[in-house]
Amino acid sequence: MESSLYETLKVTAQRAQRSTMALAQVPSGIKNKALRAMARSLRTAHSEILESNTTDLEFGRQMGLSETLLDRLKLTPQRLEGMALSLEQIAALKDPVGEIVGGWRHPEGLEIVRVRVPLGLIGIIYEARPNVTADAIGLCLKSGNGVLLKGGKEAENSNQAISSVLKAAAYEQGIPEGCIEQLPGERAVVEALIRLNPYLALVIPRGGHSLIDFVVRNATVPVLETGVGNCHIYVAASADLEMARRIVINAKVQRPSVCNAAEKLLVHRDTVVTHLAPLLEDLHAHGIEVRGCPRTVAFDPKVKSAGEEDWGKEYLDKIIAIKVVDSTREAIDWINHYGTRHSEAIVTANYEEARRFTAAIDAAAVYVNASTRFTDGGEFGFGAEIGISTQKLHARGPVGLVELTTTKYVVSGSGQIRP
């Protein structure tokens, strides 16, 4: 890590931390007014933003980015409108800052109240998704947190265009200048950013396994780990076939490149003939490459043999691996061994089996008879999300406004001293 780079970022972080302390005191009305102005500014500047994105896409193709990554990188008028709508939805949400979440009276007459407060200055590291820039700025602003954004080099023009537009709109409405900063896209910035103690309250990495692993292993700042999604669907012996087909296709085909897409399918041995055959037919028809265990390969010669590395891998592509299991207990043990604690699902008509599954599976979201694709801040009613946390401290699942706050105790007395 270059000392000059660290010192430069340190100055930026010091300035942003001061602005963040001021942001924590900004009333909800001003924050909401700023968010709505930011949404309008995205719509007004859509041509310039799309032009910057075209430059990034051309650079990405020259770099040899996969079609999956190019799809994540690409902005369209529809996606820009979605970003604007997300900012308006965040404006409409209840502000968690200042919320009283508990209180009681001490025997000595003290009034003790627990109140929500912002975390502070947050560093967000992400890869080829320009939409994260708008979501992160919007959520951090509403929750009273400053933000240092470090996007990928492949999206640098898009990220700079979006953040410039949003910062100008926010500051014009009274948001303290300096509390939103877009950092350079160079990889070296990551190493410096994750060591900016004591200025950063938290770092959130959002991207592939290698990025998240690097941040977790090297950060001296607290890290909120957002998850790689090796998500499973288990089709139990009692599963309704048509329901299973709808869920599997939705979870795998709708958007294969996202973290809540299904990557693995477990099928009970008693349903191999009745359920596996039509499920394979559906997957083949949608152009999904199927890999499988020996029993799956023996059942369908079009299935490729899965290696050990497949079972723990997040494909983020039109690929799925299938395992035939002998029992629900085996399915649970398999998922807890190979899963990434993100989203797991069971398709079953047996209530007791569903109860056992939800109790035993260690994941941020566990589904009964529904697609894993619902693990999303918008779908959960959070407006937007910074990411999906797969750890247990301090937040788990979609990270929205409430998850970007902590609490403090306000104790009021009338001269009491401890006896």
From Swiss-Prot:
Keywords from UniProt, A to Z, are: Amino-acid biosynthesis, Cytoplasm, NADP, Oxidoreductase, Proline biosynthesis
Question: Which reaction equation describes what this protein catalyses?
Answer: L-glutamate 5-semialdehyde + phosphate + NADP(+) = L-glutamyl 5-phosphate + NADPH + H(+)
Main site of residence? cytoplasm
Task: Give a yes or no for keyword Kinase in this entry.
Answer: no
Annotated compartments:
Cytoplasm
What EC number(s) would the UniProt record show?
1.2.1.41
Task: Identify this protein by name.
Answer: Gamma-glutamyl phosphate reductase
Please report the organism this UniProt entry assigns to the protein.
Gloeobacter violaceus (strain ATCC 29082 / PCC 7421)
UniProt gene name = proA
